[in-house]
Amino acid sequence: MKPKEGRIKELLRERGLDGAIVSSPENFHYVTGFGGHQHTVSRQPGFTLAVMRSDDKAPTHITTMDFEAATFRIKSAGLGFVVDPYDTWVGLKTWPEISQGAVLPDKTRMESSADKLEQFVKACDLADKRIG
């Protein structure tokens, strides 16, 4: 699919708008002509953005996760987009830092709702026996 960036910039100018932030998977694909992995997998907006100005001289910036940046640069080659990656946990921590540095919650916070309910029923039963 060919990007519709030019047509959208034209519509922005017609409506007196300076620019647009495109975050939905469908609209991102419409603007750029391609989509990201997270848009395909999760269908959630915001993982990848296209920030565009109505001025044809200003390039559209694509903000995406660090691990998709190389693919986006390849897909957008020759289209004039600027790819701006942001760091995810992939870029921020190594696997040993993630796996060995995990802070576990204390045992009381790890109890399930059923455990809490059982404790509450026992406490109420004991209180009832003392009163009655």
Regions flagged by a language model, labelled:
Residues 1-132:
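A composition/biophysics-driven feature that prefers long, compositionally simple stretches
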